[in-house]
């Protein structure tokens, strides 16, 4: 029996990593928000690896924090290990990675949702949308409840028509044997949305008491842990190590002997899997020359014995998984607590979205997270906060927020998805960002916190601290340009001690800092600033001085790109009447509907000659539009 369950500004379907950020962003911006989830006990649950961050992903977490999101604060409060990656490399690729206490993380996120006054968390299974005049105005649940809203965000993760596969066994299910969402997926197809079928997988979990750690290598966290969030002031001191072991020749023989039972190779799995997170059977087949593969043993929390076997993602039968585990050093007597599995699910083809993550087909309907074809908690959360922000802005009749490729990895990801699409689960990589020296872990707040403040997601205190940090950096940069360091015996003696050629003449401090061996701490010791800089400000000064040439070069590239972005394309431009455009270009342009010449130039299949023709056509000022 249908009944009216309430009116809201924003409805969010799903309570995973995308749904959490979407709900909190919309609510904190003043929109009355309801989050509908099949199981409120599984809010923010980590169905796959118990970790947050890593290359590119860790930078996304910092960006979410800079915009006022929750993920960074939650992991800072619940990690069991923190590590800065790529410290021996340049600043563009450094990123934090945390091992999470997945149960504490989940509880922390549920509390954040419950504590938000503008947000209601409610159990419900959404089966269809309410569409009026090509606009989404609400949802209907399996109990007949009708929720009305001005914007709806779908963040259903891998639940849509989910199917778990373990060897010859397959059954309809969401991840971790949760109930799947079947009717909503069918409903989206009925509405005309094109869906893709993707697959992901997870490894077995084992009982930590049955591991012989003496046969593995300890992997400790950093002695001095750094936070993800700029608001975190106190770090957890007691960390728990991970452990490293390897597959063996016998492991590979077991896998080869059972490939006929692997759903990946038998044709049972139809969905496309993630390129950068292959199953162990896929690795053994594709890299047959490798004698072994790394296996990381990752504790799932402080109060559980379950250990996640990173690197052993598999959908082989349960009995084969048991034998594989016991072929690995340290795991000879291990007991499996949960088997690994593959899960197939439906995803929306993301070229059907505007850069705001609103669907082109139905106004007021947004999608975010794995439903858009991405993989990973961080990618999902990054989309979630943007969908939540843009849904709230739409409700408030304000201009949308679109992050450019030069503003953040979140901008890179969304542009890739809506412009190029993806034929496999999309993972963020530093190599996807052409301006990665500008999109560093250390400057996320400088790039994005002003935006968060303008949206009302960053408070006055934090914004004032950011303004002070900016002033400190600029003041110190100017001071270093003026201060002269003389070639005294004391200075040269210190330079010689660290293997640097002595000065023959006086140098400006900024010039000396450009030398690779010289740190800002050394300069500050030789010529102390009037007021000591914070560690974060000092780091910025050093990076901005040492990489000034490269940064300036990328800023020039950004300026050229922005000129193309400013050349807007009418939303309903009729590409079919433009003579000279290649047939493939017309097809792709009609599909993506780019908003600018810059975006059009990034579409696969649209060549420079097509862009030139398009530019000339638009600049004439007279162009044909399609009917609405």
Swiss-Prot record:
InterPro entries: FAD/NAD-bd_sf (IPR036188), GIDA_C_N (IPR049312), MnmG (IPR004416), MnmG-rel (IPR002218), MnmG-rel_CS (IPR020595), MnmG_C (IPR026904), MnmG_C_subdom (IPR047001), MnmG_C_subdom_sf (IPR044920). FAD binds at residues 14-19, 126, 181, 370. It is found in: Cytoplasm. GO terms for biological process: tRNA methylation; tRNA wobble uridine modification. It holds the Pfam family SAM_GIDA_C. Its main location: cytoplasm. GO terms for molecular function: flavin adenine dinucleotide binding. GO terms for cellular component: cytosol. The keyword Cytoplasm applies. Its cofactor is FAD. NAD(+) binds at residues 273-287. Gene3D superfamilies: FAD/NAD(P)-binding domain (3.50.50.60), GidA associated domain, C-terminal subdomain (1.10.150.570), tRNA uridine 5-carboxymethylaminomethyl modification enzyme MnmG/GidA (1.10.10.1800). Keywords: Cytoplasm, FAD, Flavoprotein, NAD, tRNA processing. Belongs to the MnmG family. NAD-binding protein involved in the addition of a carboxymethylaminomethyl (cmnm) group at the wobble position (U34) of certain tRNAs, forming tRNA-cmnm(5)s(2)U34. Homodimer. Heterotetramer of two MnmE and two MnmG subunits. This is tRNA uridine 5-carboxymethylaminomethyl modification enzyme MnmG. It comes from Exiguobacterium sibiricum (strain DSM 17290 / CCUG 55495 / CIP 109462 / JCM 13490 / 255-15). The gene is mnmG.
């Amino acid at each position: 029996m249908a009944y009216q369950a309430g009116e809201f500004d924003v409805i969010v379907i799903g309570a995973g990593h995308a749904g959490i950020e979407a709900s909190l962003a919309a609510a904190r911006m003043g929109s009355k928000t309801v989050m509908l989830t099949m199981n409120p006990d599984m809010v923010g649950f980590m169905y796959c690896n118990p970790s947050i961050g890593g290359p590119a992903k860790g930078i996304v977490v910092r960006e979410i924090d800079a915009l006022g999101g929750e993920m960074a604060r939650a992991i800072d409060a619940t990690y069991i290990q923190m590590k800065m990656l790529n410290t021996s490399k340049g600043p563009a690729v450094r990123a934090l990675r945390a091992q999470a206490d997945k149960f504490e993380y989940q509880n922390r996120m549920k509390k954040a949702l419950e504590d938000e006054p503008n947000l209601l968390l409610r159990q419900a299974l959404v089966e269809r949308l309410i569409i009026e005049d090509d606009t989404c105005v609400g949802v209907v649940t399996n109990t007949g409840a009708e929720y009305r809203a001005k914007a709806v965000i779908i963040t259903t993760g891998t639940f849509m028509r989910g199917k778990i596969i373990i060897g010859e066994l397959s059954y309809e299910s969401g991840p971790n044997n949760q109930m799947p969402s079947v009717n909503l997926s069918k409903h989206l197809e009925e509405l005309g949305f094109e869906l893709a079928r993707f697959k992901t997988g997870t490894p077995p979990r084992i009982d930590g008491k049955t591991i012989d750690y003496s046969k593995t290598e300890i992997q400790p966290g950093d002695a001095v842990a750094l936070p993800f969030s700029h608001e975190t002031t106190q770090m957890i001191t007691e960390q728990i190590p991970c452990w490293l072991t390897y597959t063996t020749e016998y492991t590979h023989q077991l896998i080869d002997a059972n490939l006929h039972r692997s759903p990946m190779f038998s044709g049972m799995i139809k969905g496309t899997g993630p390129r950068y997170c292959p199953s162990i059977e896929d690795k053994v087949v594709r890299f047959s020359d490798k004698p072994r593969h790394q296996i990381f043993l990752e504790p799932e929390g402080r109060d559980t014995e379950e250990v996640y076997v990173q690197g052993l993602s598999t959908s082989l039968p349960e009995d084969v998984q048991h034998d594989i585990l016991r072929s690995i050093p340290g795991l000879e007597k291990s007991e499996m607590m949960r088997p690994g599995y593959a899960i197939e699910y439906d995803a929306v083809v993301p070229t059907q979205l505007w850069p705001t993550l609103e669907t082109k087909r139905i106004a007021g309907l947004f999608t975010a997270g794995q439903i858009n074809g991405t993989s990973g908690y961080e990618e999902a959360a990054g989309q979630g906060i943007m969908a939540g922000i843009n849904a709230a802005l739409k409700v408030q009749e304000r201009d949308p927020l679109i992050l450019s490729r030069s503003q953040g990895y979140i901008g890179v990801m969304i542009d890739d998805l809506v412009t190029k699409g993806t034929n496999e689960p999309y993972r963020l990589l530093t190599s996807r960002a052409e301006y990665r020296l500008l999109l560093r872990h250390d400057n996320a707040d400088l790039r994005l916190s002003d935006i968060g403040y303008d949206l009302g997601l960053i408070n006055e205190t934090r914004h004032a601290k950011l303004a002070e940090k900016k002033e400190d950096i600029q003041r110190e940069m100017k001071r270093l340009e003026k201060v002269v360091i003389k070639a005294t015996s004391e200075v040269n003696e210190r330079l010689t001690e660290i293997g640097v050629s002595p000065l023959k003449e006086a140098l400006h401090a900024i010039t000396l800092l450009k030398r690779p061996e010289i740190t800002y701490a050394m300069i500050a010791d030789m010529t102390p600033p009037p007021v000591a800089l914070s560690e974060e400000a000092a780091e910025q000064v050093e990076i901005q001085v040492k990489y000034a040439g490269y940064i300036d070069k990328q800023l020039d590239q950004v300026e050229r790109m922005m000129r193309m972005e400013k050349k807007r394309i009418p939303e309903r431009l009729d590409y079919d009447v433009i003579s000279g455009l290649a047939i493939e270009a017309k097809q792709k342009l009609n599909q993506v509907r780019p908003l600018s010449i810059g975006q059009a130039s990034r579409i696969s299949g649209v060549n420079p000659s097509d862009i030139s023709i398009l530019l000339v056509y638009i600049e004439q000022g007279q162009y044909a539009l399609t009917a609405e």
